[in-house]
Amino acid sequence: MECMAVNDISYGREAEIWPRDYSMLARRVQFLRFNDIPVRLVSNNARIIIGYIAKFNPRENLILASDKPKGNKRIEVKLESLAILEELSGNDAFNLSLVPTDEFNLQQYTPSRRDYFSICNKCYKQGVGIKIYMKYGQVLTGKTTGVNACQVGVRTSNGNHMQVMFDWVSRITSSDYAE
C-alpha cells in the first residue's frame, strides 16, 4: 500500500527552525515574573504546576517555579518540556501545586517538530476560534491572540490567556471545523 503525504495544514508543517527559538515566550515569562502573576504550567506529560515564576534564565531556557512570588522553594521547568503556560487571573480560586522537577521534565513523547503557524494565523485573521489537540490527550479551545514559529497564544472561555507550545500538539483545527 502506498503511503500518502498529509497536505492538510491542521497537521502542521515541518518546523523550519530547530531547536526552537523561545525568545518571544521569554518576554512573556519575564512579564509574568515581574508582575507576580500566578501561572499554571503543564508539561508534555500532563504534569501540572500551579504557582509563580520565581526566577527565569533565558540563556538556559529554564523557569524556576515556586509556591510564592520570588519564593525560595523552586522547581526547575525546562522550556523544552513545557506544553502550556497559562496565566491565572487574580479572581481565580486556585490551589498551589508543585511537582518534583524530574516528574515535570520527563519527556514521555517525542517533540513533533511541527509548525502550525498557517492554521493559527488563518483562524486569527478570520476571527474564528481554534481547537488544539495535545499529544497527551487534552483538547483546548479558544480564540487565538497571536502566533509565531513555536507557539500560539489562546484566550480561553474563562478569560485566561495561555501560550501553547507546538512541539506537544498533534493537530489544530478551527473551532467551527466538523469532521
UniProtKB/Swiss-Prot annotation:
Q: Which GO terms describe its molecular function?
A: DNA binding; DNA-binding transcription factor activity
Q: Where are the transmembrane segments?
A: none
Spell out the InterPro entries in the cross-references: Flag1_repressor
Keyword annotations from UniProtKB, A to Z: DNA-binding, Repressor, Transcription, Transcription regulation
Q: Does the keyword Disulfide bond apply?
A: no
| Pfam families, alphabetized | Flag1_repress
What is the purpose of this protein?
Answer: Transcriptional repressor of the FliC phase-1 flagellin.
Q: What is this protein called?
A: Repressor of phase 1 flagellin gene
Q: List the source organism.
A: Salmonella abony
What are the leading ranks of the lineage?
Answer: Bacteria, Pseudomonadati, Pseudomonadota, Gammaproteobacteria, Enterobacterales
